[in-house]
């Protein structure tokens, strides 16, 4: 099997992006794991696949696979790279691109300054839709993990997120507690674990342990989920700069009933071809 791909990243959250409109490729979980290997393969956090639209009202279908081979519902940084890829490869010349995902639809907008704004839809807090085991929706839940009780928020941005406010995110043991939260029994489909330090009502620092990938340089949907939880807990304003290890994202959310918007960069690194 021979195919072309692009390597891209959004603030260091890196992707292998493949056009499956003009190429016929089947990505098995084993193949994805081999390609994701940073020593023996291409190396990436997620594989992004461009497919023909499933819905006539959309331009493309957007599929996301983690480095462990599992398919997931959403990836915000990947969505920005997806938008840049389809324009760069001449698959569309639109500046407003509609895509379907495993769990919904998104609008991707290419801005004049070359940043990409993603309409992430409305954050979902109903426990059964996240999914999260709870009798009713709360702003804060108590999670017992190992030797700690975490005071956390839970939200879906098309994929599940658990957000915990901490005093010093740089010193926090994200690897230890990220793994424990990711596989916590109250999240039946596992969860992305975000740890957020509030600098001001309009600025936070965030580290995210991604489900199936570990800690990444940036997580777009994680930044969106963190801000949504912070706003619901009355800790943040409507516009927030989120500083991640890989760089900054700008998040805007006017509250329940409104869509959330994420703006940030998408970088093309190189193009390649593989024979498998």
Curated annotation (Swiss-Prot):
Disulfide bonds, paired cysteine numbers: none
Site feature: Could be important to modulate the pK values of the two catalytic cysteine residues: 161, 210
SUPFAM superfamilies from the UniProt entry: Diaminopimelate epimerase-like (SSF54506)
Main location per the UniProt record: cytoplasm
One of the record's GO molecular function terms: diaminopimelate epimerase activity
Keywords: Amino-acid biosynthesis, Cytoplasm, Isomerase, Lysine biosynthesis
Keyword Acyltransferase found: no
Subcellular location: Cytoplasm
UniProt-listed Pfam families: DAP_epimerase
Catalysis: reaction(s): (2S,6S)-2,6-diaminopimelate = meso-2,6-diaminopimelate
Quaternary organization: Homodimer.
Name the UniProt record assigns to this protein: Diaminopimelate epimerase
Species, as recorded: Aliivibrio fischeri (strain ATCC 700601 / ES114) (Vibrio fischeri)
């Amino acid at each position: 099997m021979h195919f072309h791909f692009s390597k891209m990243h959004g603030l260091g959250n890196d992707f292998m992006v493949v056009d499956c409109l003009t190429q016929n490729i089947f990505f098995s979980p084993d193949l994805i794991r081999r390609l994701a290997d940073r020593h023996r393969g291409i190396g990436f956090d997620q594989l992004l696949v461009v497919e023909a639209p499933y819905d006539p009202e959309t331009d493309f279908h957007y599929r996301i696979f983690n480095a462990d081979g599992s398919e997931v519902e959403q990836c915000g940084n990947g969505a920005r790279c997806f938008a840049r890829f389809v324009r760069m490869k001449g698959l569309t010349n639109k500046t407003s691109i509609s895509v379907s995902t495993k769990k919904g639809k998104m609008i991707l907008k290419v801005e004049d300054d070359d940043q990409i704004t993603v309409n992430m839809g409305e954050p979902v807090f109903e426990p059964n839709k996240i999914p999260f085991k709870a009798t009713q929706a709360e702003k804060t839940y108590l999670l017992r993990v190992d030797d700690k009780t975490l005071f956390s928020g839970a939200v879906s941005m098309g994929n599940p997120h658990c957000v915990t406010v901490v005093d010093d995110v740089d010193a926090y043991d994200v690897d230890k507690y990220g793994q424990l939260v990711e596989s916590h029994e109250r999240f039946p489909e596992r969860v992305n674990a975000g740890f957020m330090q509030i600098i001001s009502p309009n600025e936070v620092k965030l580290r995210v342990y991604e489900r199936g990938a570990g800690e990444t340089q940036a997580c777009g949907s994680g930044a969106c989920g963190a801000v949504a939880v912070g706003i619901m807990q009355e800790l943040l304003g409507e516009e927030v700069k989120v500083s991640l290890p890989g760089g900054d994202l700008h998040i805007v959310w006017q509250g329940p009933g409104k869509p959330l918007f994420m703006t940030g960069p998408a970088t093309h690194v190189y193009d390649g071809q593989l024979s498998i």
